[in-house]
């Protein structure tokens, strides 16, 4: 697994390689939260043009940021089994072409948001793109073990972007959705970092388990899980959502707590990966429950 081996690989890039640059699984989760952010913003249905063009613009910008991440991390990716086969790291896509691809996606996404959605959504999306692709990827990721805590704000933006795409303004309820994802990010990524600790250490990425040890990281995961559970109660406490959401948030939160405690007990070497996988299901399910509550038990509070 050397950079020399990667450079000597001259496989022709296919469309799947360019799709992989956009991190489609990550973008899909972001789009779920942006879509639900849109739907929560109004009592009825979102205008179909905003629904389609808003999410398209957000997706293109997210894909652009992901491509920049692939580009910047190409040497790091070679040192990690999880990322060794990425298209730029393996030499299937030339860095220059990757830059052009990222620029086209970003410009297209911004144009769509500016012209057919609204300027506030476009500027907030640009801020999120810059936050992830440049501030996090270029600097924070290599600078501090708190990288994903600080940088997590960019990844937490999609529900706000969706909300603003519909309403044209920032609402407190939209910020609650951001806060939920912001609180979810540390236990989500640190669980993976515990499982992949040796790879991060080999790549010289100062993830928390590398700099402070697994035991300390597991305590932090448990603490952030409690914070996350508390934060997820706020939509009910502020009358944004109702009892159906409260029940779902509590049940899902107990599940997250179970996996955090399982990591603390050190009885399963795959506990970190199990927690990581559950955290993805958790976020998806939580936002779906929000949507069900919104339509089945409308509050008529949102303006």
From Swiss-Prot:
GO terms for biological process: heme O biosynthetic process. The chain crosses the membrane at residues 26-46, 48-68, 98-118, 120-140, 148-168, 174-194, 221-241, 244-264, 278-298. It is an enzyme of class 2 (transferase). PANTHER family: 4-HYDROXYBENZOATE SOLANESYLTRANSFERASE, PROTOHEME IX FARNESYLTRANSFERASE, MITOCHONDRIAL. Converts heme B (protoheme IX) to heme O by substitution of the vinyl group on carbon 2 of heme B porphyrin ring with a hydroxyethyl farnesyl side group. Belongs to the UbiA prenyltransferase family. Protoheme IX farnesyltransferase subfamily. This is Protoheme IX farnesyltransferase. It comes from Saccharophagus degradans (strain 2-40 / ATCC 43961 / DSM 17024).
């Amino acid at each position: 697994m050397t950079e020399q081996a990667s450079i000597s690989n001259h496989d022709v890039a296919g469309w799947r390689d360019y799709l992989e640059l956009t991190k489609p699984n990550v973008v899909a989760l972001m789009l779920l939260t942006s879509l639900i952010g849109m739907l929560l913003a109004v009592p009825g249905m979102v205008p179909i043009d905003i629904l389609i063009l808003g999410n398209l613009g957000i997706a293109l910008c997210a894909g652009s940021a992901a491509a920049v991440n692939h580009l910047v991390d190409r040497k790091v990716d070679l040192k990690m089994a999880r990322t060794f086969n990425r298209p730029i790291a393996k030499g299937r896509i030339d860095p220059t072409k990757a830059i052009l691809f990222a620029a086209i996606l970003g410009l297209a996404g911004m144009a769509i948001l500016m012209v057919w959605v609204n300027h506030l959504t476009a500027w907030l999306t640009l801020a999120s793109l810059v936050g992830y692709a440049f501030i996090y990827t270029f600097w924070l990721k290599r600078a501090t073990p708190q990288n994903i805590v600080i940088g997590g704000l960019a990844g937490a933006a999609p529900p706000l972007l969706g909300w603003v795409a519909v309403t044209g303004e920032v609402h407190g309820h939209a910020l609650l959705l951001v806060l939920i994802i912001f609180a979810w990010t540390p236990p989500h990524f640190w669980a993976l970092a515990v499982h992949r600790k040796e790879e991060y250490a080999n790549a010289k990425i100062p993830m928390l388990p590398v700099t402070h040890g697994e035991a300390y990281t597991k305590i932090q995961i448990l603490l952030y899980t409690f914070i996350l559970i508390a934060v997820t109660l706020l939509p009910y406490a502020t009358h944004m959502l109702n009892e159906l959401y409260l029940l779902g948030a509590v049940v899902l939160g107990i599940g997250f707590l179970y996996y955090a405690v399982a990591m603390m007990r050190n009885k399963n070497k795959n506990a970190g990966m199990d927690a990581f996988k559950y955290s993805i299901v958790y976020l998806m399910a939580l936002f779906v429950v929000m949507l069900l509550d919104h339509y089945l038990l409308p509050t008529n509070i949102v303006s």
